[in-house]
Amino acid sequence: DDYKDYYDLDQNHSRHGLYNVNSVKTFSKVFLPALYSIVFIVGFIGNGLVSCVLVKFHNTSNMSDLCLFNLALSDLLFLISLPFWAHYAAVTEWIFGSFMCHAVTALYLLGFYGSIFFMILMTIERYSAIVHANTFLFSKYNSVKSSSALALFMWVLSLGASLPNIIFSQVKNESNVSICMIEYPQGSSWKSFSYIELNILGLIVPLSVMVFCYSRVIPIFMTLKTEKKHKAVKRIVVLIIVFFLFWTPYNIVIFLKFLQHLGYMQSSQWEQNLHMAMQWVETIAFSHCCLNPIIYAFVGQKFRNLFLKILKEWFPLCFDQCVTTE
């Protein structure tokens, strides 16, 4: 219940005494649906356009393009879950049934871990191509079958990381109100494992990989004078920086909740502060889904031209004067 537990505050606050639960719930009912709706609309349009560009104009057997496509696909899966969480926050009751509780949790987690793993893969692919150009590992995967198999493996990893929480998600009836939550077996270590997994796979592993790879890539690019290569690495670095700026606060709060689970910070004030903080940092983290398309549009000239080319095909009267040649 790390990312949904503020929906069932009534079940949690009694452990440590009363605190101002109503103020947190009122804030959730007003703030979360509006923010989730904005993120969903902006993110779905942007990532949908990215997917269209990559399918229509790019070679999906190319590993870089395949990573970008699956990154957009991960964001789309993540975004599809937001209308359900928005409704859940607004009415404080889950009305979609047990199957959808599992399904929406799966979309959320697959999108989250998919984004991480494909960003890691994209980083390793660029590192191999630049630092080890003579023995480029991914050159052997530049076929539709091989690259698709590697992408499928990333999705299997995402499913493996998500599966425990998908299995343990369930609909419970509390005081005649249905709630979708993750309930771990009594006496098990699954909840602790979930917190640790989220911090390790969500921040520590990707940060370590990216620091290692880009600390070796950047010096090589500093010696080059090819503008296109500079722009390509700039786009990837910006993607990574944005990802960590938006997800680090969330991981910090998750770590604090893990400490609370171990018996630290047990006061009612800490309980309320963490619930309120989770809403803010989780919404910030959700917003990263909107940013990848914006980065492509403003950093990559090629993507900007291809965006406009697609828009010209769909809306010729509006965009005929906007398309420029590369």
Language-model segments: residues:
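First transmembrane helix
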Residues: 28-57, 74, 208-214
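Loop architecture of class A 7-transmembrane GPCRs
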Residues: 14-23, 89-113, 131-132, 138-151, ...
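Hydrophobic alpha-helical transmembrane segments
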Residues: 67, 119, 147-152, 196-197, ...
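Extracellular N-terminal segment of 7TM GPCRs
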Residues: 1-45, 186, 194-195
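Alpha-helical transmembrane segments of multi-pass membrane proteins
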Residues: 40, 70-82, 151-162, 199-207, ...
